[in-house]
Design a protein with these regions (language model features):
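Amphipathic, small/basic residue-rich leader segments at the start of a protein or domain
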Residues: 1-68, 84-96, 100
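Conserved protein kinase catalytic domain
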Residues: 53, 75-78, 91, 147
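N-terminal glycine-rich flavin-associated loop
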Residues: 65-85, 111-114, 124
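A structural signal for short hydrophobic beta-strand segments in well-ordered beta-sheet cores
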Residues: 119-122
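A short core secondary-structure module
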Residues: 127, 131-164
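A short, hydrophobic C-terminal helix/tail in secreted or cell-surface proteins
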Residues: 165-169
Length: 169
């Protein structure tokens, strides 16, 4: 990480940009989604995943955060709660770094407590209407896949998966 990652991250930071090619390189090395089995993911244990995160963190915390959100939050949500069709579509492309995920749980008045969350969703023709506020969504400015937590009309916690194209609608 010191020799390969550091110079590129310094350049990206100087230019105030997120270098997606670094993310894709992480994917080509099997880092993104490392502990997930199948779907193009490496399927390594959590100690190995932690060591990868530690080495990235030694160079830059923001890229380590982006790596961790992709793997531990966005991809894990799809792996645990997504349909087989969603897993087959999203997980391989996220593992390659071709799609970047984010995870929206934290709210201004509720923190990261799902029980206190105010964001709600209502099923509509062709999708959902989402109302509420989220904060600190790592990767959100560059995300292609958005995992957003909200309560449905019955107050049941729901995980909504949007693509960046759908979020613009």
């Amino acid at each position: 990480c010191q020799s390969e990652l550091m110079p590129r991250i310094l350049e990206a930071n100087r230019n105030e940009l997120f270098d997606k090619s670094i993310y894709q390189e992480m994917g080509s090395l099997g880092f993104l989604g490392a502990p997930i089995k199948g779907y193009g993911c490496a399927g390594v244990n959590y100690v190995s995943y932690g060591l990868i995160a530690r080495e990235i963190e030694r160079v830059d915390s923001s890229y380590r955060s982006a790596f961790s959100v992709q793997t531990s939050l966005a991809k894990q949500a799809i792996d645990k709660f997504g349909s087989e069709e969603q897993k087959e579509y999203f997980l391989p492309e996220m593992a390659k770094g071709n799609l970047i995920g984010c995870f929206g749980l934290t709210e201004p008045d509720a923190g990261s407590d799902p029980g206190s969350m105010k964001t709600n969703c209502k099923e509509t023709e062709g999708g959902y209407l989402l109302n509420g506020s989220k904060t600190w969504i790592t990767n959100s400015p560059i995300a292609d896949v958005l995992i957003i937590w909200a309560k449905d009309e019955q107050g049941i916690l729901s995980c909504l998966l949007y693509t960046s194209d759908a979020a613009d609608d």
